[in-house]
Amino acid sequence: MVRVKHLLLIVVVGILFSCRSGEEVSDLPRPYHNLRFEKLPEVWDEALPLGNGLTGALIWQKEGKLRIAIDRADLWDLRSVEEFKSPDHSYQFICDQVLRKKDIAPIQRLIDDRTKYDAAPTKIPAGAIEFNIASLGKVRNVSLDLTSAVCTILWENGAQAHIFVPANEKGGRFFFENLPDTLSPELITPLYEENDAKLDYQPGVNKLTALGYKRGKVEQINPGTLLYQQQGWGDVSYEIALNWKSASGHSLEGEYCVTSKGTWYSEKEGALECMKQTMSNDFNSSLAMHKHWWREYWMKSSISLPDTLLEKQWYLEMYKFAAASRKGAPPICLQAVWTADNGQTPPWRGDFHSDLNTQLSYWAGYTSNHLEESAVFTDWLWKIKENAEAFTRQFYGVEGLNVPCIATLTGEPIGGWSPYSHSPSTAGWLSHHFYLQWKYSMDTDFLKNRAYPWIKEVARYFENISVRDENGERQLPLSTSPEINDNRIDAWFQKTTNYDLANIRLTYTIAREMAEALGLNEEAGYWVRQLSEWPKPAVDESGLMIAPGKAQTESHRHFSHLLSFHPFGLIDVSKGNGNIDLILRSIKNVEMLGTDWWTGYTYAWLANMKARAFEGDDVVRNLHIFIKAFCSPNSFHLNGDQLKAGYSQFTYRPFTLEGNFACAAAIQEMLLQSHTGVIKVFPALSTKWEDVSFRHFRAMGAFLVSASYEGGKIVSITVESEKGGLMKLYNPFTDKITERKMVTGETITFTNKFPMGK
C-alpha cells in the first residue's frame, strides 16, 4: 500500500508541474547531470551529499553497512582561546616583534603554535545512522537526482532505498522497499571517546577524542524510537531523535531530527518534539513539499552548453550551493553541512576562512539568480558585527570594523598562521559581498540598513589604523598578502601589499557609490578624499606585484596580489589599453611560474580571470583540469591533484568547497558579465562552441537576462527589469552600447530583426 501511495504521489506531482511551460520544465537538471555510481562509495569524502543549509547528510558504505552521516551547521566547539586573553594579543605586539625586534617566534607561540595541539575551537559532527545491508546482496546502482535532491539505492534483488534531507525540516527521511527480510537502523555516536577504530589522518586535524567530551548516551524511548543526547563544550549540546516503522517486514520508513541548544541557530524544542512535528507529515507528504522547494529553486536559472562536462558540473555546484546555504542557517564554512565523518575534526577545523574560502563560496550565487541563498553570507556577517567590532578594539586598538580572517561560528578568532589569521584588511574583501548583494538586488532597505553601515565602519577602521609615510600617503603599519611566504617573518610587509591595498581601495570606492545612492553627498566626498590618500597598486614588468619591491617570482596557490583585477574589477579590460596590458602581463606571469604549488581552487580562480580577459578557451582548459584532477567522484573539491598527473605537487585530499563554487562562477562569467555596469552576454565563450543558452541569469541593477547563441552567433537577448532603472547593454546586433530607461516589470527582447529591442 505504501508503494502504491508513493507512485500515485509522483504521478500527481508530475501532473501539477506539467502545467508549467514546456520550456521551463526542460530547463531542470536532466538525468545525465545526476551523480550515479555502480556501488556505494566507501570513503566519506566521496559520499552522496544531501542538505538543506542547516542539516546535512553523507550517504556511503562503511565496513559493509549503509551509513547516513549526520551533520548540523551550528554544531561547534566554541571554547575560547586562552592565549588570546593575553595583553600581547595585539597588532602592536606583532609590529614590535617584526619591525623592531625582528623576531617572529613570540608571535608564533602566542597565535600559531597552540593550533598544533589544541583541537578547539572547531566544527564538530553530529552522528550517523547505519543499516546492516549484508542480506540485501549486491548493489546495482546508486544515484543522486539533482532535480529532487533524493538519493536512491537499487539492489540486484529488487530492494530499494530512498533517502533525502527535507528542504524545510531539521533532519532526514528514509524509505526502503522490497526488502527480503526485516531491516532496522542503528544510531551511531561520534568517536568522542577512544576505541579501536583505524583513522585515515588528514592535514590539520585532530582526533575527536582530543575535545575531551564524554560520549552521550543513546536511549530507547519506545520500540522504533531512539534518542541520542550529546553535551558539547559549555552551553552547546545537541540531540538526534530517530524513529522508524516496518510494514510486513518488506518495507521500512523512518525519519530523524537533529536539534541544538546554546547556539544562535538553536530551537526551543528538543529533537523528540521536533520529530513529533515532522511526523505530522508522512514520507510521501514530506517528499512532495521537498520536491516542490527544489523545483522552485531550479526554476530560478538554467544553462545549456555544448561542453557536457562543464554543464554537468555547473548543475552539481548549484545543487551543492542550495544544499549548503539556506535562509536562517549559518553560511558555508570550509565543508558546510558535510563535516568529516572519520573520527576526526574536519580539515582546518571546518572554520570560516576569509582569506579566500568563504568569499569564493559565494561567487556563484549572484549571477545564478539565487540571492536568497547568497544573502545567508551577509546575514551572518551582520550577526557577527558586534563581536568583530570588539575584536577590532581589543586586537587593533582602534574603532571601526575588521573581522578575524580565521573565525568561529560567532566570529571569534581561532588563530593559525598569524599573517593571515590576523590579516589587517579581511573586512575589505568581505565588504565586497555586501556590495554584490546590493547591486544584484537593488534592495534600498538592505543598502541603507546593512550594506552601507557595515562598509562605513570598515572604512572608518582603515582610516584609524593607517599611518602616514614619508610622502604623506597612508599605509598600514604592517601588511600581508595571503598566503605569500607562509608563516615566516617575511610574510609581514612594511609597505602595504597589493592585497591589502585592493581591499582598502575597494572599500572606499563602494562606500562612495553607496553614499551617493543614499543621497549622502558630503559623506561620498569624504570617501573620495580618503581614497586619494592611499597609494596606487605596485606594478613592474611582470604585472601586479605582491608589494612594492616584491614581485611574484614563484608558483603559489593564492592570487592575493591580483585581487584588484578579480574579483573587484578596480582594474578591468573595460578601462582601456593600460589596464588590458597590465592584466595580461599579470596572468602570463602566474602561468609562467608554473602550477607546482597550486591547488584546485587556483585553477578555478584563474578560470574566472581568463573569463574577465575574454579568453574562453583557457577558461575551459582550466576548468577541465579542475574537474578531472581535483574533484572526487561526487564532485567535492579535494585541493590536491588526485590524478597525480603533474597539475600540482599537492596530491593530498582535504575536502573544501570554495573551489567548487569558484568553478560555477567561472562558467557564469563565460556567459554573462555585468560588473562594469554594462551587460555583456557571451563575453568569453570557447571558440569551439556553436550552440549555447542561459535563462534568467541576474545582472547588476536587478536585471534578469536570457540569451541564445546558435551556429556561432548571438540570436536573441531578453532583459527583464526587476526594479526599474537605466539598463546598459553591449548590443551585439549594433556593436554599440544600448541604453534604456526601464520600468519595473518591463521586458525587452533584442534580435537581428529587432536590434534595438521590442
State where each predicted segment sits.
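Aromatic-residue-lined binding/catalytic grooves and analogous aromatic/hydrophobic interfacial grooves
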Residues: E23-G415, K456, R474, T509, ...
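Aromatic- and histidine-enriched alpha-helix N-cap/loop-to-helix transition segments
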Residues: L48, E311-K312, F352-N357, N369, ...
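Aromatic/His-enriched, Gly/Pro-containing loop or helix-boundary segments
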Residues: F84, I94, P346-D351, Y420, ...
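C-terminal motif of bacterial Sec signal peptides marking the signal peptidase cleavage site
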Residues: F17-S18
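The feature captures the catalytic groove of carbohydrate-active enzymes
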Residues: C333-D351, E399-N449, E463-V528
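Sec-dependent signal peptide recognition
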Residues: R3-I10
